[in-house]
């Protein structure tokens, strides 16, 4: 049985700041060697050349080592950064750590009640020619199943959030594929971000039984195929799929629980509230921010501009805008909607949601404190 989880959200005060992680460790909230995953937002451009993700990654790993975690162990900790804090979104990190068994007393002791659990896995290496094709779907699906097993989850219905980081295509990797006589799905590096995310989401959906195995032709074209729990990011930092499965399991113990839902479109506040309720908070029929009473740890969303250029029947110009890419516009929009619900702009809102939730909407996961 996996260990119980402690999870906290902390602000990031500057690009290279990890002082709040250090404070959590110094205050005894968690131990450096027990940190198992970090998921956060950095303030870069969110694109191919967003190096704030690399800077933040280094800062957080250095703190873990400074506070006593073995360097080799720290190298293996999955740290997923989503670049781009457009609009009111505030840079932050959500940190997951295991709890020593001796600390699980009273209401926190393991029981039949489902509580938060986390599992991690890495896929086989993803070659540039795999990205956007069924080879990638298969490799991701295999890694998701391993992460589920490590989280102690046997029923896919108990998986509420799968956060991934996968490689996108760069000029260098495209050149590499061609030198070996291979082709790539696209030679547009920015488009490959959407491609990598979408293909990864299909792998998650296959692993969890949400869809049957799609064909190469379905990738990015059949938007009726999607996962309701996938949250996929991509970058230049790695050549494998990094998979973090977050769900609930009995017998784990602890004080936290996770739930999920989907936003049907960019304005669907109800979808966010449904995820919070699904996590276990008892809320009124028409809840307000004040009803959360400090019990919401964080929400995690993916968003996407609807392919028809409409929101609730009204036309918008995001997909035609040559000045500001639609990635930044929809992220800013949904970030504002989300912060209005939670009352906190430190929310994980990430763009590029192909095959992640319905077209124009996206998955929502919420972690709450039931302690």
From Swiss-Prot:
Active site: 165, 233 (nucleophile)
Annotated region (RU C), positions in chain: 256-371
Example GO molecular function: barbiturase activity
Binding site for Mg(2+): 304, 353, 356-358, 361
Family (UniProt): Belongs to the cyclic amide hydrolase (CyAH) family.
Means of activity regulation: Inhibited by cyanuric acid.
Domain of life, per lineage: Bacteria
Record flagged with keyword Signal: no
Name of the protein this chain belongs to: Barbiturase 1
Function: Responsible for the hydrolysis of barbituric acid (2,4,6-trihydroxy-1,3-pyrimidine), an intermediate in the oxidative catabolism of pyrimidines. Catalyzes the hydrolytic opening of the pyrimidine ring of barbituric acid to yield ureidomalonic acid.
